[in-house]
A protein has these predicted regions:
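Short, surface-exposed, low-complexity cationic segments
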Residues: 180-192
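Acidic Gly/Asp/Thr-rich repetitive segments characteristic of extracellular carbohydrate-active
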Residues: 172, 204-244
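Active-site and glycan-interaction determinants of carbohydrate-active enzymes
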Residues: 137-182
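Predominantly extracellular beta-rich ligand-binding scaffolds that present long acidic/polar faces
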Residues: 1-144, 157
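Short coil/turn segments at beta-strand junctions that form active-site/ligand-binding loops
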Residues: 27, 54-55, 194-196, 240-244
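Surface-exposed intrinsically disordered loops and tails
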Residues: 122-133, 157-167, 205-222
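Boundary/junction segments of secreted and surface-exposed precursor proteins
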Residues: 192-207
Length: 244
């Protein structure tokens, strides 16, 4: 499995493609703003032999998703604890259970109740080399993700007040507060700034020359670059989320 907790806070983690479970929790644990994807047995579960009720466990603002819910439990061993699950997005979940939770479909690039990650893994359990290195896995959120603006800020306030946890940034170091809304999971969606929208067009043979000091950097139609890959490379060099 990925994480085992007997007590404490599990905050801002990405846990994916483990051959066991994602997070195994015993008791007295707050699980907040995690992204838990395509683990073999379950997303979050409890030890099978535990004799502790687990009434001090809470799960909030987390996404628990799998492409194969038939052989994967989003939450395992939580039958008596569903009231402790709030503002989460869970694959194949009964939305009448818990508080303000979302049931996700086992698809990604789709309309409806789907996470719409940038580039999630496409299988369950461990991914073996050398394939793993070429995946370019990303659990950043697209602008049409159902996870946007569905998290509850009070859970993060509690972490800050009682544990001193810095909740200002997501796992990528980006601001958590964007347009006064919070997103479910470890990543906060970051709107594309105007600076990171690059223009591409076919340049004509009689293209007017650039003025002194100007650079064809894609920042305007007049300064558009002529190759999509060139624009993508510029965004990559900036380590920026952008559009072409």
């Amino acid at each position: 499995g990925g994480i085992y907790s007997e007590a404490g806070v599990v905050f801002d983690n990405v846990v994916y493609n483990n051959n066991g479970g994602g997070i195994c929790v015993y008791d007295e644990t707050s699980i907040v703003n995690n992204t838990i994807v395509n683990n073999q047995l379950y997303g979050i579960g409890r030890p099978a032999d535990t004799d502790v009720a687990g009434s001090s466990i809470s799960v909030s603002n987390s996404v628990i998703w799998s492409i194969n819910p038939l052989n994967h439990a989003g939450l395992k061993g939580f039958d008596a604890l569903v009231d402790r699950v709030s503002n989460c997005a869970i694959v194949d979940w009964d939305e009448t259970k818990g508080n303000d939770n979302i049931s996700l479909l086992p698809y990604n690039d789709h309309t409806g109740s789907v996470p719409n990650f940038i580039n999630p893994t496409t299988q369950i359990g461990a991914i073996l080399e050398p394939v793993y290195a070429d995946l370019g896995v990303s659990f950043l959120l697209r602008q049409n993700s159902v996870l946007l603006s569905k998290a509850e800020g009070s859970w993060m306030t509690t972490l800050n007040t009682y544990y001193g946890t810095d909740v200002s940034y997501d796992i990528a170091g980006k601001p958590r507060i964007v347009s006064k809304t919070l997103d479910i999971g470890a990543y906060q969606y970051q709107p594309v700034s105007g600076r990171n929208i690059l223009y591409v067009r076919q340049l004509s043979p009689d293209e007017p020359p650039l003025a002194d000091g100007e650079v064809r950097d894609g920042s305007t139609w007049r300064l558009a670059v002529q190759d999509v890959q060139m624009a993508i490379d510029q965004l990559y060099a900036r380590n920026a989320v952008g559009g072409v």
